[in-house]
């Protein structure tokens, strides 16, 4: 999405978002007491922005993010919420009976595998924006 930002500004934003997402890998490892389970070398896939339109049924149905050979290198998913949508637009984890409320700056990190099907719920009065990406094996 280009809102008039220069190429230099866009690169700076991209670099900062990438750095922020990658820094959460260490926090994730600390929170889960992971020491050697994740690869020592990995990369971040391209960063994507998803817009959920207001007052619609715009949503992502229950799914997993690793479902074929092309996506099989993914081992962590990242959602950086850019907007607050109180009581709507949650990310729901079906088997965990868990809903994550979108709040600006909140980063959700989880394995994108079959154990963690999730859905992006529709929003009501206001649009929802998230930045998403994946860590993958090199």
Region locations from a protein language model:
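Fe(II)/2-oxoglutarate oxygenase catalytic core
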Residues: 1-107, 115-138
């Amino acid at each position: 999405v280009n809102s008039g930002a220069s190429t230099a500004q866009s690169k700076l934003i991209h670099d900062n978002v990438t750095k922020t997402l990658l820094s959460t890998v260490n926090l994730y490892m600390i929170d889960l007491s992971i020491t050697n389970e994740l690869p020592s070398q990995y990369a971040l896939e391209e960063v994507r922005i998803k817009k959920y339109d207001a007052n619609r049924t715009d949503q992502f149905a229950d799914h997993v993010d690793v479902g074929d050979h092309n996506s099989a290198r993914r081992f962590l998913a990242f959602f950086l919420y850019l907007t607050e949508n109180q009581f709507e637009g949650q990310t729901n984890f079906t088997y965990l009976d868990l809903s994550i409320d979108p709040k600006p700056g909140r980063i959700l990190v989880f394995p994108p595998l079959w154990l963690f099907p999730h859905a992006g719920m529709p929003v009501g009065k206001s649009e929802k924006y998230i930045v998403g990406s994946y860590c993958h094996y090199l």
